[in-house]
Each structure stands twice: as structure tokens, then as C-alpha cells.
Swiss-Prot record:
Mg(2+) binds at D487, D493. The gene is pnp. This is Polyribonucleotide nucleotidyltransferase. The lineage of its organism: Bacteria, Pseudomonadati, Pseudomonadota, Gammaproteobacteria, Lysobacterales. GO terms for biological process: mRNA catabolic process; RNA processing. Its cofactor is Mg(2+).
Length: 704
């Protein structure tokens, strides 16, 4: 195939899609150029599904190569290692709008790999990767109901910005990524500085409108490339098997969905499934029905039963009304030795959240393609298998945990103090101890309380809520505070976090087409009411940050010195600063601009270290009298330490008004003496006098 190129303007950027020259053995391969940021995105689909495959094995890997930024990786091996948090998050970002566009029965393995090969530090690779994945899948001839487009939206001075640069995002009140088809929005990911629901919805519609250009270009590319449509055909439904299954189930599932407790309901449904499949086993053997097909159709009956019940009765499977939030319990200060902690329970979802305060050196150093930087606010989310009553793998965080942690972090980011306002590294850990839907939003609520319990001066409390949707034709219901089953069997997962003032984070994943602006508007308004209710419940535990830090949290004292004085504080080979930290038991961080941060659990020790540093960095004043210690005896005089790291010379003629034949007759090393500064010359040498002090005191005594 000859090389095909498509170029278009997208916001301020020139975007080029190329295919037919590189990675020609892949099912679909596209070079995406976003100005100087260049990605190779490939898509390969297996020719057939594996025997017994009962799920869709889609894998998305986004990777940033260090050579893209002209850098060599750090570490011993000097090559890229496992995926970074950023790479994992962008991999999920690509997966989420693509997965629902494959047919339900398609089980062939599909792999998408997006490789950043050249990076302009001001242009991130996320939107280019989404566009490339859409184009590569469209070229691969898979049964992909795309293409999709993607756009990043910023907001400043009341105006939306299409695909803002990294620099522009620093001043933007919003960073929102939206992806979708020509007719529908499928995915939204955002963080905002407490914006209104109207502004957030406007950003989604703005991004969806602008991305139509991308969709049109990808369609043109596939036509020019001569891509053949997929010949995959969905397996025919076995109507006889489905009818027999429905007859055997009867109204048992409808009754099971009346059980309000999650675990009891799950046990009831499992028992029905076991009985029904057991009863149908003899006929299944005769008819040749596969056990996997029976189990799949039973799941479809579950899906239809729950949805039909909610749409017709407007009552949910746990008995709640559509807009009712589950009972909430919130407690702060639940762990005695931590710096801040909270227990947040909403129905059968529960999180223990802990805040730990550290110094600047506790920040995480990120070695990225665009350069090294330090992260001083860390948010970690853990989802152990016991939280859903199961056994399972336990260890390093999975992609889902990294994604949920990032969403929860986005929820509280807008209210966090700057490093200048609160010079601590802050780590928040959310331990999910029970889960039945919306554990990431429970993490937002719990982290808000834990931060306030730790004394972190956040601007306002934050709460989060997950919304759901059940839609059949024109009939739909929006659900507040969804359960796990409602998430699994519903058409939308719509998470909103924010304060009473506005939205701080919004994440939306839609499984069907046809979600209108009206539905999104209703979901946002219903979410606002739910969020305000949750904030009211949280207020029973804590409403403002505590004024005092925990007894176990480090106290930070900050002082500013002239950068030229830094070497005096450090001393030769680090001797001075090591002596201060050892004597006072403190931890001291010195920044290049002369900012010194002293950390200690003991406030008195921190103050002692501060006094030592102030003494070292203070200038010696001519004419002032100091008390010093004799450091060294010489034939011509004695060196006296008047301040830490500052020695001056008392010449033999300045030791006494009497004639001194031998310095050692008058002074010994270690003696404490009072000296007057006679002069500090241009080279910083200090001339001292003991005689001048004695003469001055003599004159004063005579006057009295």
C-alpha cells in the first residue's frame, strides 16, 4: 500500500495522520504528528477467538520512550521499565471509549500499542494516542463501530480552549478530555477548579463538536486506504435454548432482586443459577447446548430483569428511590498514631483514609521523558479482595487501582493548599474495606475528612457521588449513588466530585449511544443535590481543618537566607549541617533559593536548629561584643569562635592592656571570653579585641 497522508488544523496544532509506510505487517498502523509530538499507533486483531474464550481480550499499552525527549533513562539498566503511572492512566483513557464499540459477542484478542517517538514537552501524547488508536482500529478491518474522535478542553476567562498546551493548562481552570463517535459522547475525564455544572456540560459539548473534524479525517483515510469491512458475523442466537432458560427461571430472578442485602442477593441469584442450569443439564446434553452459552444467557436474563424492574417501578434493587443516597456514617480521627484519619461509610461501601505529612524531601521524584520533577501530593488507593468478600491476588496495584486513585486525587486537588502555603509533602492512602459501588467517590469523601483531621488547610470539604443510567428507547431513569450491580448492568457510570461551590472532577463512561445533552444535564443536577446531601452528612464529623497538627506530625519551620550563605550552613563536607541535625534531632532541607525548612516532631528542637542557623548566617557587626570560645592558640594571638563557623583573630596586642609575652599565659583553648569586633575587612577576616572590652567596662565603672 502506498503512503497516505492526511493533514488538518486542530485548535492551534497541525495534525498529520500517515499510514502505509511504517509497521505494514500490523493490522492497522498510523503515524500521528501533533506538531513536534509524534506517535506510532498500531492495532492488531487475532483472526479467531481462543477456544472457550468468554470475554473480550482487549489490551491497550501506551508507552513514552525516553529518546522521544532526547534523554537516557536513569537507573542501572538504562532502559524503560514497567509502565509509569502516567502511561497506565493514558492506556486506560484509550481503552474506555473503544471497548464499548466492539460487538458484545466479539471475543477475538485485540492489541493496541501507542508509542511516543518524539515529544514536545508542551504537547502531551494523550489526545494524539486516542486519535491514533481510533485510526489504527478503523484501518485494521475489525468490527469496530467507530471511528471515535478525541479533544482536550481548557477554560479561561469564560472561554473554552481547544487542545491547550501544557503551559496553557497551568493557567486554565479546567482540563477535560472527551471522546466519542460522530453521534455520541462515550468518555469524559476531567479536573476543574470548582466550576459550575453548566460550564462542565458546555465543555463536553464544545469538545464533542470540535472532534467531528477528526472523525471525518479518519473516515477519509480508511476510504483512501481501501480498508475492507470486517467479515466477522455474530453467532446466531439459540432461540430454543433461550426459551427453555426463561421458562425454567420464571419469576425467580425478579424475586431475588427484591433481596436488599448485596451478599444475600448474590447468594440467591447464584442458587437460582445453579438450580436452573442443573435442571436443564439433561436437555442441554441432548440438544448440544454448551454450559458457557447457558451461563451467558442467564447473565442476559439478569440484565433484563434488573433494568425492567427499575424502569417500570422506579424503585431500585435495594429499595431506594431513584435519587436517594444510601445511609452515611463519617468519623474523623479514628487512628491514634497517624497524622490524620477518617472512616467513611456509605451503605455497603466503606473506606478508611489516612493522611501522612512529610518534608519536601519525602516528595516523589518522577523521571519523565520531558524531564525530572517532584510530586509533593500523593494519593494511593488500595482495593483488597476481602472488600467484596472474595479471595484474590494481593500485591502491587493494578491498573484499576491506579485509575481510581487518580480520580480521587483529582477530586480534592482543587482545594489543596500550595507548597508555599503549607510546605509539607502530603500522602493520602485510601484503604477500601467494603465495596458495593462507587469506592472511588468514598475515597474522595474520606480523604477530605482525613486531610482536615491532619490540619491540612484545604479550601473547603469535598464530596463525590457516582450516578448511573438505565435507558431503553426513549424511556430512561438516572440513578444517584449507584450500587455495584447498577454499575455493571446499567448504561452509564458518571462520577462527580466537588464542594458546595462547584465541580472539582468529572468522569463519565457510557456504554451505549444516544446519551443526549438532556440526560447529562439531569445527571449533573441530580449529582449536585446528592453531593450537597453528602457534604451535610460529613459535616457531623468535621467541617474545617484542625488548627493543631497531630503530636506525631513533623513541625516545619521555614527561614530564608541569602543564597550566598548556603555554603556556610552546610559547612566543609557537610560538617556544619550534620552537627546541627545530630545535636537537635531535626531534619533540614536547603533549597537553591536560600529557603531552609526545618522539620521535627519536637517544636523546641526545631526552634534550637533555627537559632543555630540564624547565628551562622547572621553578619558579624563591627563594634559589637560577642561571647566566644578560644579555638586555637598561636604565637601571634588566638582564634576565637564568636558564631558557628565564624572565627576571628585576637592579636597578642589585643589580649590585655598589660604586656603579654606568651599567649598561652593568658588564654587556653576552650576558654570562654568576651571580645569586641574591631573590623571585618574586605576578605571577611575578623579582628577581635579582649582589651577593648575590658577598657570599655573600666570606663563604664569609673562613670558610675
Amino acid at each position: 500500500m502506498a503512503k497516505i497522508t492526511k493533514t488538518f488544523q486542530y485548535g492551534k496544532h497541525t495534525v498529520t495522520l500517515e499510514t502505509g509506510e511504517i509497521a505494514r505487517q500490523a493490522g492497522g498502523a498510523v503515524i500521528v504528528k501533533f506538531d513536534d509530538t509524534v506517535l506510532l499507533v498500531t492495532a492488531v486483531a487475532a483472526k479467531s477467538a481462543r477456544e472457550g474464550q468468554d470475554f473480550f481480550p482487549l489490551t491497550v499499552d501506551y508507552q513514552e520512550k525516553f529518546y522521544a525527549g532526547g534523554r537516557i533513562p536513569g537507573g542501572f539498566f538504562k532502559r524503560e521499565g514497567r509502565a509509569t503511572e502516567k502511561e497506565t492512566l493514558i492506556s486506560r483513557l484509550i481503552d474506555r471509549p473503544i471497548r464499548p464499540l466492539f460487538p458484545e459477542d466479539y471475543k477475538n484478542e485485540v492489541q493496541i500499542i501507542a508509542t511516543v517517538m518524539s515529544m514536545n514537552p508542551d504537547i502531551d501524547g494523550d489526545i494524539a494516542a486516542l486519535i491514533g488508536a481510533s485510526a489504527a482500529l478503523s484501518l485494521a478491518g475489525t468490527p469496530f463501530k467507530g471511528p471515535i474522535g478525541a479533544a482536550k478542553v481548557g477554560y479561561k476567562n469564560g472561554e473554552y480552549i481547544l487542545n491547550p498546551t501544557v503551559t496553557e493548562l497551568k493557567d486554565s481552570q479546567l482540563e477535560l478530555v472527551v471522546a466519542g463517535t460522530a453521534n455520541a459522547v462515550l468518555m469524559v475525564e476531567s479536573e476543574a477548579e470548582l466550576l459550575s455544572e453548566e460550564v462542565m456540560l458546555g465543555a463536553v459539548t464544545f469538545g464533542h463538536r470540535e472532534m467531528q473534524k477528526v472523525i471525518n479525517v479518519i473516515n477519509e483515510l480508511t476510504v483512501e486506504a481501501g480498508t475492507k469491512p470486517s467479515d466477522w458475523v455474530a453467532p446466531a442466537k439459540n432461540e430454543g435454548m433461550i426459551a427453555a432458560l426463561k421458562e425454567a427461571v420464571g419469576d425467580q430472578l425478579a424475586s431475588a432482586f427484591q433481596v436488599r442485602d448485596k451478599l444475600q442477593r448474590r447468594d440467591a441469584i447464584s442458587a437460582i443459577k445453579k438450580d436452573v442450569l442443573g435442571a436443564l443439564a439433561p436437555r442441554a446434553t441432548i440438544e448440544g447446548w454448551a454450559a458457557g452459552d447457558l451461563a451467558k444467557e442467564f447473565g442476559e436474563l439478569e440484565y433484563q430483569t434488573m433494568r425492567g424492574s427499575v424502569l417500570s417501578s422506579k424503585v431500585r434493587i435495594d429499595g431506594r428511590a431513584l435519587d436517594t443516597v444510601r445511609p452515611i456514617s463519617a468519623k474523623a480521627g479514628v487512628l491514634p498514631r497517624t497524622h490524620g484519619s477518617a472512616l467513611f461509610t456509605r451503605g455497603e461501601t466503606q473506606a478508611i483514609v489516612i493522611t501522612t505529612l512529610g518534608t519536601a524531601r519525602d516528595g516523589q521524584v518522577i523521571d519523565a521523558v520531558s524531564g525530572e520533577y517532584k510530586e509533593n501530593f500523593l494519593f494511593h488507593y488500595n482495593f483488597p479482595p476481602y472488600s467484596v468478600g472474595e479471595c484474590g491476588r494481593f500485591g502491587a496495584p493494578k491498573r484499576r487501582e491506579i485509575g481510581h486513585g487518580r480520580l480521587a486525587k483529582r477530586g480534592v486537588l482543587a482545594v489543596m493548599p500550595t507548597l508555599e502555603e503549607f510546605p509539607y509533602t502530603i500522602r493520602v492512602v485510601s484503604e477500601i474495606t467494603e465495596s458495593n459501588g462507587s469506592s472511588s467517590m468514598a475515597s474522595v469523601c474520606g480523604s477530605s475528612l482525613a486531610l482536615m483531621d491532619a490540619g491540612v488547610p484545604i479550601k473547603a470539604p469535598v464530596a463525590g457521588i457516582a450516578m448511573g443510567l438505565v435507558k431503553e428507547g426513549n424511556d430512561f431513569v438516572v440513578l444517584s449513588d449507584i450500587l455495584g450491580d447498577e454499575d455493571h448492568l446499567g448504561d452509564m457510570d458518571f462520577k462527580v466530585a466537588g464542594t458546595a461551590e462547584g465541580v472539582s472532577a468529572l468522569q463519565m463512561d457510557i456504554k451505549i449511544e444516544g446519551i443526549t445533552e438532556e440526560i447529562m444535564k439531569q445527571a449533573l443536577q441530580q449529582a449536585k443535590a446528592g453531593r450537597l446531601h453528602i457534604l451535610g452528612e460529613m459535616a457531623h464529623a468535621l467541617t474545617t481543618p484542625r488548627q493543631e497538627l497531630s503530636d506525631y506530625a513533623p513541625r516545619l519551620l521555614t527561614i530564608k537566607i541569602h543564597p550566598d550563605k548556603i555554603r556556610e550552613v552546610i559547612g566543609k563536607g557537610g560538617s556544619t549541617i550534620q552537627a546541627i541535625t545530630k545535636e537537635t534531632g531535626t531534619q533540614i532541607d536547603i533549597q537553591d533559593d536560600g529557603t531552609i525548612i526545618i522539620a521535627s516532631v519536637n517544636a523546641i528542637a526545631a526552634q534550637a536548629a533555627k537559632s543555630r542557623i540564624e547565628q551562622i548566617t547572621s553578619d558579624v557587626e563591627p563594634g559589637r561584643i560577642y561571647e566566644g570560645k578560644v579555638a586555637k592558640i598561636m604565637d601571634f594571638g588566638a582564634f576565637v569562635t564568636i558564631l558557628p563557623g565564624k572565627d576571628g583573630l585576637v592579636h597578642v596586642s589585643q589580649i590585655s592592656s598589660e604586656r603579654v609575652e606568651k599567649v598561652g599565659d593568658k588564654l587556653k583553648e576552650g576558654d570562654l571570653v568576651r571580645v569586641k569586633v574591631l573590623e571585618v575587612d574586605k576578605q571577611g577576616r575578623i579582628r577581635l579585641s579582649i582589651k577593648a572590652v575590658e577598657e570599655g567596662e573600666g570606663v563604664q565603672a569609673s562613670a558610675e
